[in-house]
């Protein structure tokens, strides 16, 4: 399969030229740009037997912020699912080879001058690296009657880019678990609930406590 994805924000005001050479604010100098991430994916999957299926995607990433910043990157994702009766297990490995995004900046002299005047660092051409991430998941479906069932699921995101503010934080691995349930009525009504985004945040006294969503 071939897929194209775009995630972006349009009509962002560019105020780097808001003030003219005489120091006057001129709103007519405001222009607008879009910031978007685009992905071109070539995917393949197949069923190895009645229980096991595998697949993968090769992706080309293009990132763009107006006319002054562009990036190209490449990466590979792999996955596998195993199903046995009411149990399902899944593994997704994202950015297996690490995904490299090569950034190039094209700034006008006015933009560069604005960066200096506002005390901001000039962006430099470079490589943005997305390290591998593994997602493990398991689910179990409980059938009560012909038209009623309850599905439980647990997922864990395992990142490899160092300590994160998650339940299990380590170096270089951090683990972020998620729990969820879905109550199914006649395949028409679905009631869902879940727990995730477990983090340490300060309370009113400044003490760190765990919070969940």
Where are these regions (language model features)?
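Subset of outer-membrane beta-barrel
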Residues: 1-213
């Amino acid at each position: 399969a071939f897929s194209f994805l775009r995630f972006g924000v349009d009509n962002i005001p560019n105020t780097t030229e808001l003030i003219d050479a005489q120091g006057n604010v001129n709103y007519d100098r405001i222009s607008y740009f879009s910031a978007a991430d685009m992905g071109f994916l070539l995917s393949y999957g197949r069923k190895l037997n009645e229980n096991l299926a595998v697949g993968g995607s090769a992706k080309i990433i293009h990132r763009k912020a107006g006319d002054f910043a562009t990036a190209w990157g490449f990466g590979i994702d792999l996955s596998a699912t195993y199903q046995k009766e009411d149990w399902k297990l899944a593994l997704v490995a994202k950015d297996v080879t690490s995904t490299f995004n090569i950034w190039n900046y094209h700034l006008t002299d006015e933009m560069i001058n604005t960066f200096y005047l506002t005390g901001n660092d000039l962006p430099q051409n470079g490589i943005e690296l997305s390290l591998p991430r593994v997602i493990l998941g398991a689910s179990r479906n409980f059938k009560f009657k012909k038209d009623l069932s309850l599905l439980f699921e647990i997922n864990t995101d395992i990142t490899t880019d160092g300590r994160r503010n998650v339940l299990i934080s380590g170096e270089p691995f951090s683990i972020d678990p998620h729990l969820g349930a879905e109550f199914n009525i006649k395949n028409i009504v679905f009631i869902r609930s879940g727990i995730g985004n477990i983090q340490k945040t300060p309370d009113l006294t400044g003490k760190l406590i765990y919070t969940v969503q």
